[in-house]
């Protein structure tokens, strides 16, 4: 770091960091005034920090850590190292936030609308911030209004001024294939960055979009996209991926005529996208199935408001945390349609829970529930645990079962067939005292229950470790 330059920890991490500082301060019996005196700042500044309303420089983090006699976090060159104090029962309740995957898809889809799109309850996370920077760089007007995001496309998008630095830091840039073909006959996009887990290829997108008259050529640093007249068609997806399904849907949304998409993903973010497009007047049949029939609407110019639905992956995180700590907590606003198989497998392992309430999300489509967890004694399943495209066990939820398996009596067999290397990272659990056998880069055996111990572990280069 250059002398005189202070590196800052920005939102959304500031909120979590503030909560941690408050917990440590309360545990040590230190008042806000006392902490402020120790770090030579004002009590109001400490209050803002604990509410997540003030960014913290690395210097301030060091001063707070010293004043509390507890490291809050440590920063590496490219990563944040988090210290966690274990052996605590969880208590209380938590409300699930809206999904990152749904949010970025809706941001991209807002380019299909010439009017103003207001997306309610948008998650303030880095992936969203990076995509905002990309959209603003090409002329899109993006405004935050509390937790709502207002998006208004310009009359003319200037793709030549795209913020490459932000684009290469997010995988969500690939979601712009579908919308931008309605603006340009030729354009280029940088290769996406972000999550580096597993090998990724543009071929499924190429094969899907070429059915509409689009060509994608991958060069060293960019994708070169060109098209002729866009026409509706029958599209058989090369793989049932979420992003390729979303791109095919967004391509079809403004092409007049009927498009049929087969072997489509029916995952939560895809359904959220379909519900959003319906509010724009696009007719979609088969939502929630693997075959979608879309009647495109060539001209979309309307001011609409839509609420992003909740994140089943975050819900699974809190379910897992409750299970491994044997805690009784309440998890509110869980999108149950995308957790039912996970809950069934957990139930067969011995997990005890009850559903307190059923209701609709703000989009009036997604089914939500409140879940109450109870301390449970688990046994390993005889069958292997593997992920599948929806309605299978969610691919992003499989790693949670590796941690849960350390607390289940017997040997659990986990088959992570989607990613080439993710199962290797499960071996990090050995550092915590877990008993694992890596059969190959896709399969691992975990024997429990294990009394886990504290140690240093490394997370994979992924958004969903």
Region spans (language model):
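A short, Lys/Arg-rich alpha-helix, primarily the initiator
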Residues: 2-27
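Residue-level marker of regulatory loop/turn positions in helix-turn-helix DNA-binding domains and
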Residues: 10-14, 53, 310
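Intrinsically disordered, low-complexity tails and linkers flanking structured cores
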Residues: 1-8, 112-118
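Helix-turn-helix DNA-binding motif, specifically the short coil turn and the N-cap/start of the second
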Residues: 31, 42, 53
């Amino acid at each position: 770091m250059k002398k005189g330059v202070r590196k800052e920890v920005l939102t959304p991490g500031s909120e979590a960091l503030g909560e941690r500082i408050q917990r440590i301060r309360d545990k040590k019996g230190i008042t806000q005034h006392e902490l402020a005196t120790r770090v030579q700042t004002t009590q109001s500044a400490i209050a803002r920090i604990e509410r997540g309303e003030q960014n913290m420089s690395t210097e301030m983090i060091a001063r707070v850590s010293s004043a509390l006699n507890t490291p809050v976090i440590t920063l590496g060159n490219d990563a944040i190292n988090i210290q966690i104090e274990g052996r605590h029962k969880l208590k209380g309740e938590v409300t699930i936030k809206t999904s990152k995957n749904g949010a970025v898809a809706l941001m991209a889809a807002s380019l299909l609308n010439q009017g103003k799109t207001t997306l309610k309850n948008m998650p303030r996370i880095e992936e969203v911030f990076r995509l905002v920077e990309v959209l603003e760089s090409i002329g899109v007007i993006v405004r935050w209004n509390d937790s709502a995001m207002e998006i208004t496309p310009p009359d003319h998008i200037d793709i030549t001024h795209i913020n490459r630095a932000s684009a290469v830091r997010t995988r969500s840039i690939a979601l712009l294939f579908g919308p931008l073909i309605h603006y340009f006959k030729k354009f280029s996009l940088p290769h996406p960055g972000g999550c580096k887990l597993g090998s990724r290829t543009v071929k499924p997108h190429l094969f899907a979009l070429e059915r509409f008259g689009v060509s994608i050529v991958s060069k060293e640093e960019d994708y070169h996209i060109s098209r002729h007249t866009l026409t509706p068609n029958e599209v058989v997806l090369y793989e049932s991926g979420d992003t390729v399904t979303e791109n095919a849907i967004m391509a079809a949304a403004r092409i007049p005529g009927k498009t049929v998409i087969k072997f489509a993903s029916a995952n939560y973010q895809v359904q959220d996208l379909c519900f959003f497009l319906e509010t724009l007047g696009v007719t979609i049949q088969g939502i929630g199935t693997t075959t979608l029939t879309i009647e495109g609407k060539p001209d979309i110019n309307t001011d609409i408001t839509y609420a992003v639905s909740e994140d089943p992956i975050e819900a699974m995180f809190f379910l897992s945390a409750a299970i491994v700590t044997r805690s009784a907590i309440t998890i509110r606003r869980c999108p149950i349609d995308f957790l039912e198989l996970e809950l069934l497998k957990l139930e067969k392992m011995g997990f005890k829970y009850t559903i307190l309430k059923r209701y609709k999300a703000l989009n009036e489509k997604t089914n939500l529930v409140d879940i109450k967890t109870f301390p449970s004694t688990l046994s390993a399943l005889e069958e292997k645990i593997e992920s599948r495209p929806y309605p299978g066990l969610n691919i992003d939820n499989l790693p949670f079962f590796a941690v849960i398996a350390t607390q289940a009596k017997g040997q659990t067999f986990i088959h992570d067939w989607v990613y080439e290397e993710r199962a290797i990272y499960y071996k990090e659990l050995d550092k915590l005292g877990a008993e694992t056998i890596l059969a190959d880069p896709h399969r691992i055996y975990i024997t429990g229950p294990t009394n886990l111990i504290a140690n240093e572990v490394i997370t994979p280069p992924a958004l969903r470790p």
